[in-house]
Amino acid sequence: MSAEILLILVIALLLDRVLGDPDWLWSRLTHPVVFFGKAVEYVDEALNRGEFTKAWLKFRGVVGILVLLAGATALGVVLARLFDVLGALGSLLEVVTVAVFLAQKSLADHVSRVAAGLRRDGLAGGREAVSMIVGRDPNTLDEPAVCRAAIESLAENFSDGVVAPAFWYAVAGLPGLLAYKMLNTADSMIGHKSPKYLHFGWASARLDDLANLPAARLSALLIAAGAYFRRGAEAAKTAIEVARRDHGLHRSPNSGWPEAAMAGATGVQLAGPRIYGGVKVDEPMMNDAGRAVAAIEDIEAAVTVFYAACSVMTFAFAAAALPLLLF
């Protein structure tokens, strides 16, 4: 963790906060994550075919994810060395590269569209907007469930779309950032428990859990800090208490931390029973002392907490860089 890396990260966070993922750019260019997805598809098609034993499928899945991670890491090393040779221009290109893999503004924009859709077009508008960011069947959601889904998506993706990429870049530079994004892409594509991927995707899912472990805990603390600045000390205290108590109620070992913290920060109940691909997932509600009926205003409150949490994180990285720059 060098001063240069931290400084680049801070500037990249600010750039992503302002510009996000502009449609005019990515309608003309292919986003790097799309290439990562194509690499995952290639490995899936090459290794996950035919009839194999469970153990052999797991082994092939381990080989597949290691190949993908090695490729992403090697690309990160090449880019880091190239940018280093290019001097100031290279630093600028590295800022842009890091910003591309962050999701502050794009995430907040997607979640805010759910609130806007509900206000403009009622339940149909909210369902359409939330279907862009969650995997559950939107037609099974009433308005409070749409609001909960949006808030849960915001909290979970704060961890793996903002905090985790920033964390791994700070720790391991571009190789760490690209390896994390490849792993996270693989987990989203092959890390689920469908019959096809239960064994082949096992290694990707477990490694993703491990890689997100520090970021998930940091996300809960950052959400509590954001709640402190936007909603007061009591909201921050509740966010910490609910995160510590209820994170284990979630089926994911990591997602429960930011979601429970956001439930406490906004004062609403989150999680609970929901339907994915026609299959009902029964989970208890997080923050069972909170309001049972989430509303549009709760989405908007969550977005303000999210942005405050992002600001706290950016300030923390800047504060960490300062003594390294001075001494």
UniProtKB/Swiss-Prot annotation:
GO cellular component, one term: plasma membrane
Pathway of action: Cofactor biosynthesis; adenosylcobalamin biosynthesis
Transmembrane stretches, start-end: 63-83, 84-104, 158-178, 305-325
Keyword Transmembrane among record annotations: yes
Coiled coil: none
Keywords assigned by UniProt, alphabetized: Cell membrane, Cobalamin biosynthesis, Membrane, Transmembrane, Transmembrane helix
Subcellular location: Cell membrane
InterPro entries per UniProt: Cobalamin_biosynth_CobD/CbiB (IPR004485)
Gene Ontology biological process: cobalamin biosynthetic process
UniProt entry tagged with the keyword Transmembrane helix: yes
Gene Ontology terms for molecular function: ABC-type vitamin B12 transporter activity; threonine-phosphate decarboxylase activity
Topology of this chain in the membrane: Multi-pass membrane protein
Family per similarity comment: Belongs to the CobD/CbiB family.
Role noted for this protein: Converts cobyric acid to cobinamide by the addition of aminopropanol on the F carboxylic group.
HAMAP family membership: CobD_CbiB (MF_00024)
Protein name: Cobalamin biosynthesis protein CobD
Organism: Rhizobium meliloti (strain 1021) (Ensifer meliloti)
Species lineage: Bacteria, Pseudomonadati, Pseudomonadota, Alphaproteobacteria, Hyphomicrobiales
